[in-house]
Amino acid sequence: MRTVLALMNRNRKLFFKDKGMLFTSMITPVILIVLYATFLAKVFRDSFTAAIPDMITISDELINGTVAAQLTASLMAVSCITVTFCVNLTMVQDKANGTRKDFNVSPVSRGKIYLGYFLSTVANSLMVNGLAFVLCLGYLFKMGWYMNTADVLWVLFDMILLVLFGSTLSSIISFPLTTQGQLSAVGTIVSAGYGFICGAYMPISNFGSGLQKVLSYLPSTYATSLIKNHMLHGVFREMERKHYPGEMVEAIRDTLDCNPVFHGNVVSVNQMIGIMIGSIAVFGIIYYLVILLSKGEGRR
């Protein structure tokens, strides 16, 4: 275990030593929240107000708080996954600059080497996304704050789950890559496409029924819905306190993807947590098997 921790710390130091990569990773959440607030806030606001009956009046503060909570939840859902591909660059860099050849002739097992990469990816991703979460809380405080301490802690738990999910996924995808250009290309594809697939840029409820059924099989759908449920929990609590019709509140929950459906059944929050834990376990096993089955790497 001491060897694994030493490798993890070595990878983390390399991440902090690369000022360009560190700056890019740290500035990404700031850029995302500005872009989301600029281009997606109106889309989210229109989607929310469309579910409100004409005879119901909702204060601008509650509307702004709802839109801000949906926006920040979407940002965190994307950031927790895409950032892992950026901070996982060390694994590819070691192959590109020949450092892995030194590791391969050392007495350290391949499993420990790759576990060190994985743990450093998790640690660095949590740091970057922790900054993103602080920025999101500041934005929520400005636009409309309805969260309590329990809601904040649940979102932190969601963030850890999503970072673990993203780290296992990025480790599997990055494993066969040998150049920084390849990882940059993969990172670009993931950054551009993941937000649409997970329902962050546009609620999945706005998609066609066929596409909704396809996306219901992807864990990313439930990852986004999970963090939305906890980010928006205070908003729905405020709506219930003001005695808004239950049908309207449920319609809003459906519109914002807080009630994902799988084969006609609504997936509960506890089930979403189970899906994420199961997905992390499955991808972790796949990553372990990929390491075991890689042929000849240690002899090259």
What are these regions (language model features)?
Residues S47-I63:
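Perimembrane loop-to-helix junctions flanking transmembrane segments
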